[in-house]
Amino acid sequence: MKVYRNWLPIGFLLVALLPGCAALGQIQKPAVKPISPAELPSGNGWWRVRFRMNWPPDTDPVWHMDLYIAHQVIMPLLEKNKNDIYLWRFHRRAKRDGAGRQFTFYFYSPPRTAQQIFEALQSNPILIDTMSAGVIDDIVYDNPANIERPNIDDASDKNWPLSIQKTWPYYINGGSRMWLNLVAEIADQDLQDDPPASIEEIDSFYRQVDETVTELWQENGRHAFLHHLNAVFEYEPLIYWEKRFIDF
């Protein structure tokens, strides 16, 4: 009876807690939906503008003019069409192959918005001057009459799990937005005083902006970007490029 009396309060406690446990377990699966900035209407697609940058043989790729295009050309278009562009991102690459040195702007929108953006870019005086100066070799546009990538995951890497393909566009949109805002934050501080005029001055100006962005990335990227992303994933290590675990 002594043992029974010792366990009796615990038994009452467990009985009292059972209703609470049952309530905690009542997860309504249909109510759990992915978070998105807005309900994406049908009839949209991913579109690309590929800036094929000049890259002479036996030279290092020139990256800083991407910042000029992004800041002075793409950023105003994003602001003007912000209600019709649901997602967007940048991609930069330099490889000695058919595509070569390329700066690509992806955006998810209706075809009419893509058509308007393409027309605006084709008549943009900055791009015309940049091509005349030999900085850009060619600009390749998608065909807005044909939606080849209608799904949100159609511009993601097909080697990834489908769950990542569907959610990654929101992640890279945020990363691209921060990069562009960082470029603008740095550039706008100096543009107020003595803005560059000639292509040579523009080249020098955005080279300096690029160097500052690179310094910020190298000195603060581990904590500001990688560490806090690692924190979201519970500080779990990941398999790095060298096929070993690393955390931030």
Task: Show the residue positions of the predicted features.
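Sec-dependent bacterial lipoprotein signal peptides
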Residues: 1-19
